[in-house]
Amino acid sequence: MTKQRTLSIIKPDAVEKNVIGEIYSRFEKAGLRIIAAKMKHLSKAEAEGFYAVHKDRPFFSALVEFMISGPVMIQVLEGENAIAKNRELMGATNPKEAKAGTIRADFADSIDANAVHGSDAEDTAAQEIRYFFSDTEIFG
């Protein structure tokens, strides 16, 4: 078992639905510790920078507009196999394909407004965590 850190973002649709606490409860019940957290309304530049890997994809502009449409809750999760565990909790990107009981099956509206973001690998997790948090903001 490997202790890992991963970045999680509760997106504007889920923040608007007031389900932050329910999502946090799922993280904690799965053995993930929240070791850093902040609520933020992303600027267009911040959203574009965070999702720069997708800049040439057809959905990029819509994704950026969605991510700046309201506040997001950004957190660092830590635990055994945190990346895979968080991705399992989130469910499939398309909520229609997500297993019952996953965050996206329960709280997402569409493939675009899909409630949460989670890092997909250790290198991207480290990069994404550094994008939003300094070392002094992480308590693990």
Curated annotation (Swiss-Prot):
Active site: residue positions: 117
| Keywords assigned | ATP-binding, Cytoplasm, Kinase, Magnesium, Metal-binding, Nucleotide metabolism, Nucleotide-binding, Phosphoprotein, Transferase
Q: Which of this chain's residues are annotated to bind ATP?
A: 11, 59, 87, 93, 104, 114
Q: Which GO terms describe its biological process?
A: CTP biosynthetic process; GTP biosynthetic process; UTP biosynthetic process
Q: Name one Pfam family in it.
A: NDK
Lineage top rank: taxon = Bacteria
List the EC numbers from the record: 2.7.4.6
Compartments annotated for it: namely: Cytoplasm
Known catalysed reaction(s)?
Answer: a 2'-deoxyribonucleoside 5'-diphosphate + ATP = a 2'-deoxyribonucleoside 5'-triphosphate + ADP; a ribonucleoside 5'-diphosphate + ATP = a ribonucleoside 5'-triphosphate + ADP
Name the Gene3D superfamilies on file.
Nucleoside diphosphate kinase-like domain (3.30.70.141)
Q: What class of enzyme is it?
A: transferase
Gene Ontology, cellular component aspect: cytoplasm
Question: Which cofactor is essential here?
Answer: Mg(2+)
Record-level Gene Ontology MF annotations: ATP binding; metal ion binding; nucleoside diphosphate kinase activity
Alphabetical list of HAMAP family matching this protein: NDP_kinase
Complex and partners: Homotetramer.
Task of the protein:
Major role in the synthesis of nucleoside triphosphates other than ATP. The ATP gamma phosphate is transferred to the NDP beta phosphate via a ping-pong mechanism, using a phosphorylated active-site intermediate.
What family name appears in the similarity comment?
Answer: Belongs to the NDK family.
Q: What is this protein called?
A: Nucleoside diphosphate kinase
Q: Which organism is it from?
A: Francisella tularensis subsp. holarctica (strain LVS)
Q: Which gene encodes it?
A: ndk
